[in-house]
UniProtKB/Swiss-Prot annotation:
Keyword annotations from UniProtKB, A to Z: Aminoacyl-tRNA synthetase, ATP-binding, Cytoplasm, Ligase, Nucleotide-binding, Protein biosynthesis
GO-annotated cellular components: cytoplasm
Superkingdom in the source lineage: Bacteria
Catalytic activity: tRNA(Asx) + L-aspartate + ATP = L-aspartyl-tRNA(Asx) + AMP + diphosphate
Residue span of region Aspartate: 198-201
Name of the molecule in the record: Aspartate--tRNA(Asp/Asn) ligase
Gene Ontology MF terms: aspartate-tRNA ligase activity; aspartate-tRNA(Asn) ligase activity; ATP binding; nucleic acid binding
Amino acid sequence: MMRSHYCGQLNESLEGQEITLCGWVHRRRDHGGVIFLDIRDRDGLAQVVFDPDRAESFAAADRVRSEYVVKITGKVRLRPAGATNANMASGMIEVLGYELEVLNESETPPFPLNEFSDVGEETRLRYRFLDLRRPEMAEKLRLRSRMTTSIRRYLDENGFLDVETPILTRATPEGARDYLVPSRTHAGSFFALPQSPQLFKQLLMVAGFDRYYQIAKCFRDEDLRADRQPEFTQIDIETSFLDEKDIMGLTEGMIRNLFKEVLDLEFGEFPHMTFEEAMRRYGSDKPDLRNPLELVDVADQLKEVDFKVFSGPANDPKCRIAALRVPGGASMPRKQIDDYTKFVGIYGAKGLAYIKVNERAAGVEGLQSPIVKNIPEANLNVILDRVGAVDGDIVFFGADKAKIVSEALGALRIKLGHDLKLLTCEWAPMWVVDFPMFEENDDGSFSALHHPFTAPKCSPEELEANPAGALSRAYDMVLNGTELGGGSIRIHRKEMQQAVFRLLGINEAEQEEKFGFLLDALKYGAPPHGGLAFGLDRLVMLMTGAQSIREVIAFPKTQSAADVMTQAPGVVDAKALRELHIRLRETPKAE
């Protein structure tokens, strides 16, 4: 081997030993005739000292520059008093260099790798192989590796089998657009890249494998956000003969074990909350429990007011009026309130009413708001008591369709929590349960809230009689307002699966065409089964404190789903297209 140690392995116990390092020159400094090189490898940094007494190695050190690849042999010694570096794992020692061999030179990188600099993301992605040399980036990928090792070990110890499922499969309606792959051997037909291994893992349960997992690549052709990529990694889990409580306990144990092993953090039992309670109190099905702000329903106090902005929604069963108290918010300037009004407009809110509570004991005179004149004092007092308002607070109101109010005030709650630094702890894991089975579309049709294979908490007859009121056996794990993973007990009887398909508007012919293999499998003794899938990229992002999942993926795509380093996607030559039976047609130019 070319090296005896990694840089990060050097410590006081090696004092006096001769070692060999291989790595990159992270930083070079010339101090009073002595040359210091900080050498970097994947494990960390080590300081190597070259003095003029060893003329050959000193001359070599004098020639090297940042990012040269070098091999260095020398002796470990303690640093002089006052020269230790607590920011380096090897900061108590240094290496007195004897030999230096340049293994490869380097041009000057397009951005500095040894200091923080505000480099545009596109430049970083164009030179990702250099960006990943930066210690903070390398540390994120090292932590990701430790995480997957911990997860695999936990699942292996709990009897799970690691089974690979196909990447080339067929398109199924799972919500997002599929990435399609044309078949050369079946003209006019296309494979689809999997959005998840959902159906294959269910078929593995039918096959009797009982406990399955996979660190799976998944693909979705959707609009990208900070937590989305066209290809992403999923911790995919499925089990037989376990109910919701069992699966949630098993996977919660995995996450608690992961945080203990990787970050040395102990979590207690995760609280459970129904979907209905989460939406009512927090305006979100993935609430951030670090934030103490809550939404409070107040429509009952506004039904009779002479103010249609409130009385209209208060008397409409499809609408909601909610209040959000912000402690100490009465000092907010008008511009800040206007900014928050614009913010909720993103979510469809037509405005943002508010009351500043200056002095409650003074009655209406102690309240500052354009709306107080429209609300009887008795009702105002009930509202302020209900939200717990005291002097110095501000209370915001949302009145509109229930979905708009929940989303707008839920998003405002999160923004206020961060803007005003209200978060009460660093980590807040939880479970959300009892989701609706379906969501109703504007045209009266239904869509599956999770996916069409989720089991309901009722019989097929009850489901078809009242689909809007049906609850599912689904569960989501949420951490700090981010959905870590979602799962459910699956449908394991053909009759129930067909009933769900019918409610989703999938007729028998389409059922047979797209899901015939699944319906066939359910006829042959499919066991009760369920599972869960975690977004690995999102989990790594949270555990490293990264701002985007692009920071924790080795070679991510941009927000326009492109790879600026390899220039993918790229143009394909005409011969390859002919072999795939594809002809490109130019889009006519607009007149």
